[in-house]
Curated annotation (Swiss-Prot):
Keyword entries, A-Z: Cell membrane, Disulfide bond, Glycoprotein, Ion transport, Membrane, Phosphoprotein, Transmembrane, Transmembrane helix, Transport
Pfam families attached to this UniProt entry: Kazal_2, OATP
Intervals, Cytoplasmic compartment: 1-20, 81-86, 185-203, 268-311, 378-381, 537-545, 624-670
Protein name in the entry: Solute carrier organic anion transporter family member 1A4
Places the protein is found: Cell membrane
Keyword check for Disulfide bond: yes
Protein topology in the membrane: Multi-pass membrane protein
Gene3D superfamilies: MFS general substrate transporter like domains
Biased composition (Polar residues): 651-662
Main subcellular localisation: membrane
GO BP: any one term: monoatomic anion transport
Segments on the Extracellular face: 41-59, 112-155, 225-242, 334-353, 406-513, 572-605
Length: 670
């Protein structure tokens, strides 16, 4: 019985001593971290409405993840390789769970969400409520009561979200650089592209789950369980609606903590893949030799750091690759972060529907592209130079295809006084004093409260009062306003709650946009793995962990942090009507000028991506001077060593420590 238990224990240890088991655990970590990140992005609009903050602040919250990552990335990427990498990854996953939990805290500390409305609670219960009354007292004006303004300070609770996202970023830091370097160190070189493709596939499965979770939570009212939803006068398509964003963060917290557990059972080092089948004597000898090498590495931590930094900074392909990545990250982060907001405004759909469509249409082709790209690299043993050309041409093809989305657009919502006149004539610019017209000047209406209604003439109005409606019947979302003096139609001049629908033609354009996105996502992801292998193979083996970390560091500080902030500020400039808080301060934007929004959302990323192809061309030219390991017999070559020209060799002629020389003896092939 004792022998049987010993065999089981030995089998358990062996299971955690294989690179494929680590790959499975790391893939789960990739799923959990991308699940959390995607869910966060899908809920940014809900957070914006919950706290009544502008898009620029939302961009700061989104960029705070990168700030947390930035605080540790260089330290973790270099010093982490000298420590226990699997345990550090496990700790990182647990910290991500803590950050997600902290993000959800404001919901439990704040009161109920109150959306702006012109409908008094009594009028919602009455079948004969007059909303347009001459010389009435405007009881719905923003309050000047100091106690109410103190309550309004609850909007500062978004700082919890900011800090939680920073902590989430700190926890995510060790997963990619340490996980990638661990696989690169102990996997066969020809299997490495496939393994990375599997990891990237995990990074698309996570977003798929995250978007589906976001879609479900966005359909649930934020205060579900504590309010009677039948009394609500808004629906998920309304820009004042706030979904139960906090539920998903609790789910993400639990998933991240569960994902962290397996990493605490993996050893610090593994045998190189393919050596496990050797005899016990050979296996033990190699393991002992590897342990001695690790001890030597730990003696020269800080000394090697500066040597590696100098070597990487003198690597032209590596430095240009960083430049390309920074430019493209600025483009892609902007596009992905604000895609739900753009599609909501462009096509008039709810957050829940948009997020669901993003997950359904865009993520499966990305997942398929990553997987096929990794399989192609493994099957055909594509050299680094060929991989660079494949990545370049596929990226360029997808970039040119993206311009088709410029014609898949819709017009602004027809809102009287904002985008059109009360006669239905479109306005080129927003003029605030046009909100009032002859048909509603005697109604004593509030001009800054957003409570839109749709008239049976096809025009929307900022409120039932501004539509000149004198009477309402029904309750909740079924309320109908009648006797509306501003609505000129052959019917009974009535209106219902909410903006008018943009029509079937606009809905068809959304489908065309999604089809183009499917093709574009597949093409781009197909070339992502070849492109990433260029980054990994242009560095020496001992530099890979630091190189990947430095690459991530530059993308975070020059792209991930500033991009959402300046992009959000530009989007704010396209706002036509801001929500109003209790103390009269502007809240979240209720409606954007979609034409200006479109030019910023599509135009700026297109310009940035276009600029990135110039240094990419320079890399293709520069690579002619290099001999990559995939182009020659790898059995006699350092895995990431490159033959440089005489001039370039001077830059990398640094004094190597014995540790670096020993690491350089490791043999791999592409």
């Amino acid at each position: 019985m004792g022998k049987s238990e010993k065999e089981v224990a030995t089998h358990g240890v062996r299971c955690f001593s294989k690179i494929k088991a680590f790959l499975l655990a790391l893939t789960c970590a990739y799923v959990s971290k991308s699940l959390s990140g995607t869910y966060m992005n899908s809920m940014l609009t809900q957070i914006e409405r919950q706290f009544g903050i502008p898009t620029s602040v939302v961009g700061l919250i989104n960029g705070s993840f990168e700030i947390g990552n930035l605080l540790l990335i260089i330290f973790v990427s270099y010093f982490g390789t000298k420590l226990h990498r699997p345990i550090m990854i496990g700790v990182g996953c647990a910290v991500m769970g803590l950050g997600c939990f902290l993000i959800s805290i404001p919901h439990f500390l704040m009161g109920r969400y109150e959306y702006e409305t012109t409908i008094l609670p009594t009028s919602n219960l009455s079948s004969n409520s007059f909303v347009c009354t001459e010389n009435r007292t405007q009881t719905l004006k923003p309050t000047q009561d100091p106690t109410e303004c103190v309550k309004e300070m609850k909007s500062l609770m978004w700082i919890y979200v900011l800090v939680g996202n920073i902590i989430r970023g700190m926890g995510e830091t060790p997963i990619m650089p340490l996980g990638i370097s661990y696989i690169e160190d102990f996997a066969k070189s020809e299997n490495s592209p496939l393994y990375i493709g599997i990891l990237e596939t995990g990074m698309t499965i996570g977003p798929l789950i995250g978007l589906l979770l976001g879609s479900s939570c966005a359909n649930i009212y934020v205060d579900t369980g504590s309010v009677n939803t039948d009394d609500l006068t808004i629906t998920p398509t309304d820009t004042r609606w706030v979904g139960a964003w906090w539920i998903g963060f609790l789910v993400c917290a639990g998933v991240n903590i569960l994902t962290s557990i397996p990493f605490f059972f993996f050893p610090k080092t593994l045998l190189k893949e393919g050596l496990q089948d050797n005899g016990d004597g050979t296996e033990n000898a190699k393991e002992e030799k590897h342990r001695e090498k690790i001890k030597e590495e730990n003696r020269g931590i800080t000394k090697d750091f500066f040597l590696f930094m100098k070597s990487l900074s003198c690597n032209p392909i590596y430095m240009i690759f960083i430049l390309i990545s920074v430019i493209q990250v600025n483009a892609f982060i902007n596009s992905f972060t604000f895609m739900p907001k753009y599609l909501e405004q462009q096509y008039g759909k709810s957050t829940a529907e948009i997020v669901f469509l993003m997950g359904l249409y865009m993520l499966p082709p990305i997942c398929l592209g990553y997987l096929i790209g990794g399989l192609i690299m493994k099957k055909f043993k594509i050299t680094v130079k060929k991989a660079a050309y494949i990545g370049f041409w596929l990226s360029l093809t997808e970039y040119l295809l993206s311009f088709v989305s410029y014609i898949m657009t819709c017009d602004n919502f027809p809102v009287a006084g904002l985008t059109t006149s009360y006669e239905g004539v479109q306005h080129p610019l927003y003029v605030e004093n046009n909100v009032l017209a002859d048909c509603n000047t005697k109604c004593s209406c509030l001009t800054n409260t957003w409570d839109p209604v749709c008239g049976d003439n096809g025009l929307s109005y900022m409120s039932a009062c501004l539509a000149g409606c004198e009477k309402s019947v029904g309750t909740g979302t079924n309320m109908v306003f009648q006797n509306c003096s501003c609505i000129q139609s052959s019917g009974n001049a009535s209106a219902v709650l909410g903006l008018c629908d943009k029509g079937p033609e606009c809905a068809n354009k959304l489908q065309y946009f999604l089809i183009i996105s499917i093709i574009g996502c597949f093409i781009f992801s197909l070339g992502a793995i070849p492109g990433y292998m260029v980054l990994l193979r242009c560095m020496k083996s001992e530099e890979k962990s630091l190189g990947v970390g430095l690459h991530t560091f530059c993308m975070r500080i020059l792209g991930g942090i500033p991009a959402p902030i300046y992009f959000g500020a530009l989007i704010d400039r396209t706002c036509l009507h801001w929500g109003t808080l209790k103390c009269g301060e502007p809240g979240a934007c209720r409606m954007y000028d979609i034409n200006s929004f479109r030019r910023i959302y599509l135009g700026l990323p297109a310009a940035l991506r276009g600029a990135s192809f110039l240094p990419a061309l320079f890399i293709l030219i520069l690579m002619r001077k290099f001999q990559f390991p995939g182009d020659i017999d790898s059995s006699d070559t350092d895995p990431a060593e490159m033959k440089l020209t005489a001039k370039e060799s001077k830059c990398t002629n640094v004094h190597r420590s014995p540790t670096m020389q020993n690491d350089g003896e490791r043999k791999t092939k592409l």
